[in-house]
A protein has these predicted regions:
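Active-site helix of classical SDR
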Residues: 142, 179
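Conserved glycine-rich cofactor-binding loop
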Residues: 40-41
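Residue(s) in the substrate-gating loop at a strand-loop-helix junction
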Residues: 161
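Conserved NAD(P)H cofactor-binding loop of Rossmann-fold oxidoreductase domains
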Residues: 110-115
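C-terminal beta-strand-loop-alpha-helix "lid" module of Rossmann-like NAD(P)-dependent dehydrogenases
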Residues: 197-250
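Rossmann-fold cofactor-recognition segment
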Residues: 75-88
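Substrate-binding pocket helix/loop in short-chain dehydrogenase/reductase
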Residues: 118-119, 126-128
Length: 337
């Protein structure tokens, strides 16, 4: 990575530090209700337990009866049968939450899946299924609950990934990266459109934390391994398969628990000044490559055209964006009214 990108990346990483909300919910916020999809395991479950312990009320979306039963045992949690690909379950969840009379302050669109396949050997049915959960699921949930969120002038938090920024550097992750890039674009546009209603929208971009998405991905790969034959990426996919077999056999992730992600979700939901994006990684390397990728794409866009910026002009633009982010100035595109 060129020296300028490394230096700028280090500066940018510091800008992403969090100021978590206090450990206990403020009295005025206690019992505010939020909906978390995909709350049976991983980031969703961790966040549901943390928010409930701090006095918020959590509607926890889950698909399986045993998960619903387990979630209902947690104080300040009501489990909701909710498959984000099933419109009838979404409609029923809306009616249930409306009937509870608490209103709805926030949505955490957390449900997601990952399927590994190289782009030229992926199956269209897998791509459709992945987008049905990761993209259309976010769209369906947000659209269905938008009236309640507008009424409360609340929050929408979409769980994206560093994969929503990274692309082109990891074989077989293309479909997942496509879906998370879509979530990034959706979040940016939604934030713009909902601002006029007093609703704030954020994306969380977690790195590699312990979650159920990895084990689910591996179990799916193992189950389908006898039927999947690769021509161009056989060695790569065999290596992934062997790694998945070891992972499933051990049953334990070496990644840290998603406490930092839950803190970011809580900040986005309840802080007076939530950020639009929260890059949350367990180590500096994942932050560096994510910020570095953003700079790489910026420099590629700027390369050798009629309106390219010089290095000095790019740094000046970065300083201006930094000032806007800190609230020291407002954006001026230089366009006459």
């Amino acid at each position: 990575m060129p020296r300028i990108i490394k230096n700028l990346a280090l500066v940018a990483i510091f800008a992403l530090s969090l100021n978590p909300v206090p450990a206990l919910a403020r009295d005025a916020e206690a019992k505010k209700a939020v909906l978390i999809t995909g709350a049976s395991t991983g980031i969703g479950r961790f966040s549901a337990e943390q928010l409930a312990a701090e006095g918020y009320f959590v509607y926890a979306g889950a698909r399986k009866a045993r998960d619903i039963e387990a979630l209902n045992k947690i104080d300040n949690v009501m489990a909701v049968r909710l498959d984000v690909t099933a419109q009838e379950e979404i409609d029923a969840a809306v009616k249930l939450i409306e009937s509870e009379g608490r209103g709805l302050w926030g949505i955490v669109n957390n449900a997601g899946i990952n399927i590994l396949d190289p782009m030229i050997e992926a199956q269209e049915s897998d791509l459709k299924f992945l987008f049905d959960v990761n993209v259309y699921g976010v769209f369906r949930i947000t659209k269905a609950f938008a009236p309640m969120i507008i009424e409360s002038e609340g929050r929408i938090v979409n769980i994206s990934s560093i994969a929503g920024v990274l692309s082109g550097g990891l074989p077989a992750y293309g479909m997942y990266m496509m879906s998370k890039h879509a979530v990034e674009a959706y979040t940016d546009q939604l934030a713009f459109e909902m601002a006029g209603f007093g609703v704030k929208v954020s994306a969380i971009e977690p790195g590699n934390f312990s979650s159920a998405i990895g084990i689910s991905r591996c179990k799916r790969m193992i189950a389908n391994s006898d039927d999947r034959k690769y021509v161009y990426f056989a060695d790569v996919m065999q290596e992934y398969l062997e790694g998945c077999k070891e992972y499933v056999a051990e049953g334990v992730s070496s990644a840290p628990p998603p406490k930092l992600v839950a803190d970011a979700i809580e900040h986005a939901l309840f802080d007076d000044n939530p950020k639009e994006h929260y890059l949350v990684t367990p180590n500096p390397f994942e932050s560096m490559i994510t910020i570095g990728k953003s700079f790489e794409e910026l420099l590629h866009l700027n390369q050798d055209h009629e309106y390219s910026y010089t290095r000095e002009e790019l740094i000046e633009l970065m300083d201006e964006e930094w000032a806007i982010l800190r609230g020291e100035k407002t954006r001026d595109w230089g366009v006459d009214d």
